[in-house]
Amino acid sequence: MKRASAGGSRLLAWVLWLQAWQVAAPCPGACVCYNEPKVTTSCPQQGLQAVPVGIPAASQRIFLHGNRISHVPAASFRACRNLTILWLHSNVLARIDAAAFTGLALLEQLDLSDNAQLRSVDPATFHGLGRLHTLHLDRCGLQELGPGLFRGLAALQYLYLQDNALQALPDDTFRDLGNLTHLFLHGNRISSVPERAFRGLHSLDRLLLHQNRVAHVHPHAFRDLGRLMTLYLFANNLSALPTEALAPLRALQYLRLNDNPWVCDCRARPLWAWLQKFRGSSSEVPCSLPQRLAGRDLKRLAANDLQGCAVATGPYHPIWTGRATDEEPLGLPKCCQPDAADKASVLEPGRPASAGNALKGRVPPGDSPPGNGSGPRHINDSPFGTLPGSAEPPLTAVRPEGSEPPGFPTSGPRRRPGCSRKNRTRSHCRLGQAGSGGGGTGDSEGSGALPSLTCSLTPLGLALVLWTVLGPC
């Protein structure tokens, strides 16, 4: 019995020694290998120029960061079937073969960040990594995301793509990432957010898009983001944001929109109304235009502050000059179109209210102020705001040539003022007519002259005429 137990102890010791030898014996010269807390091969900052040969097959963690590795060949880690963490960040990687990570079905964390020469990744590189939950591709100089790059990464929760040179978000790029909770896209060159950019991200909690060049967001871009709690869009080129894009964000708690060239005119009314109802935490939304509202927070304005339209008259240039954009401007919004609003609110910036600008001086028929009409009219006559009531001359008094409503002559025959018994006596009427030097026209000659003559004579003159005609009594 004792002999059997002694044999078992020797066998157990032999197995333990064999396992230790498998880890320690083949450890590459520049690396340190240890078993606790997990089987680890650690080779950071050793000046390595290639992936070392002879990494223990039992390794669960491999640290190769901070070296001079420029290429990851195919099947470099195929023997490491138990690998869960692989760090290759802060190297000089310029190429990763499509099959570099083949066989790593248990891999959970892959860090490729800080490899500025990488620039592109083969779409098949991450295929087969079904358990991967964290992927670092930040600061890799990436210029595009190839089709199908993240296909099959159903377990991915954290995706770091910040500080690259990405210019676009292709449709359905993240479609398979149904469990993704954090997406970092800040610090790129993205100019627009298309409709299908974030399709399939039903679990997304945090979306960071700040410090890009975003000028347009499609109204349905955030349709699948019902669980999103944090959205950063600050430091972009946004002058307007459709509230249709914000409507699906029912769980949103943190919103940052500052450092954008917001135009606070009639186009901002829907966003203003949405912000009034938003109960989460939001940054200021400083206005860029019109000039009278520059620097003021859109959230703190009144609805009647958002009047008129700031319309560029010359060649288009981006409003915010901090970052150039190749995007073309959209057409006039509905509230700025002539059939939706008075043309007086669609004006050229910088043009004063004067008789030389017929558009500003025009007052539509039936648009007179209530009451007796004696007060000055407040007309939003430029994209830079409403003129005060004390402006001289009042806009309602400006009637430049050609601004009268059609169908009414601008000048006509002048009618001679007549006499009215309401305000004149009979004698005053006679004297006034005689003093006017006029009398009648040619129609008063002949038989019709006597009544006109008698109307214009004094009582003494009338008596003399009657005496001459009838003779002395």
From Swiss-Prot:
Changing R227C: what effect? Answer: In SCZD; uncertain significance
Top-rank taxon: Eukaryota
| Record-annotated membrane-spanning stretches | none
Q: How is it modified after translation?
A: N-glycosylated. O-glycosylated. Contains terminal sialic acid groups on its glycan chains.
Q: Give the quaternary structure.
A: Homodimer. Interacts with MAG. Interacts with RTN4. Interacts with NGFR. Interacts with LINGO1. Interacts with KIAA0319L. Interacts with OLFM1; this inhibits interaction with LINGO1 and NGFR. Interacts with OMG.
Q: Which organism is it from?
A: Homo sapiens (Human)
Report the function annotation for this chain: Receptor for RTN4, OMG and MAG. Functions as a receptor for the sialylated gangliosides GT1b and GM1. Besides, functions as a receptor for chondroitin sulfate proteoglycans. Can also bind heparin. Intracellular signaling cascades are triggered via the coreceptor NGFR. Signaling mediates activation of Rho and downstream reorganization of the actin cytoskeleton. Mediates axonal growth inhibition. Plays a role in regulating axon regeneration and neuronal plasticity in the adult central nervous system. Plays a role in postnatal brain development.
Report the GO terms under cellular component. Answer: axonal growth cone; cell surface; dendritic shaft; endoplasmic reticulum; external side of plasma membrane; extracellular exosome; glutamatergic synapse; membrane raft
Its protein name is: Reticulon-4 receptor
List the carbohydrate attachment sites: N82, N179
MF terms from GO for this chain are: chondroitin sulfate binding; ganglioside GM1 binding; ganglioside GT1b binding; heparin binding; neuregulin receptor activity; signaling receptor activity
Look up the signal peptide feature and give its range: 1-26
Q: According to the UniProt entry, which residue ranges have a biased composition of type Basic residues?
A: 413-429
What does the UniProt entry list as the effect of changing R292H?
A: In SCZD; associated with disease susceptibility; unable to mediate down-regulation of axonal growth
